[in-house]
C-alpha cells in the first residue's frame, strides 16, 4: 500500500505503443522511418517508425508514447 502511494506521489506518467493521432482521430501517414521517429520523439516517445501496410495504411507507430499524446482509437477519422 505504501509503495502504491509513493508511485502516485512521484507523478510517473504511463506510456504505450500506438499509432500517434491528430486531434480528429486520424493517423499521420508516412513514407520514411526518420519522419516518424522525429514526430514521435518530439511528442515524448522513446522512438517511432513508419508501419508499412498496417491497419491504417502506412502510418507512424510510436514506442513508449506518453498518455497525454492522442493515439488512434477505433472509430472514424473526422477530417
Curated annotation (Swiss-Prot):
GO terms for biological process: defense response. Keywords: Disulfide bond, Ion channel impairing toxin, Neurotoxin, Secreted, Signal, Toxin, Voltage-gated sodium channel impairing toxin. Residues 79 form a propeptide. GO terms for cellular component: extracellular region. Pfam families: Toxin_3. Belongs to the long (4 C-C) scorpion toxin superfamily. Sodium channel inhibitor family. Alpha subfamily. Binds to sodium channels (Nav) and inhibits the inactivation of the activated channels, thereby blocking neuronal transmission. This toxin is active against mammals. This is Neurotoxin BmK-M9. It comes from Olivierus martensii.
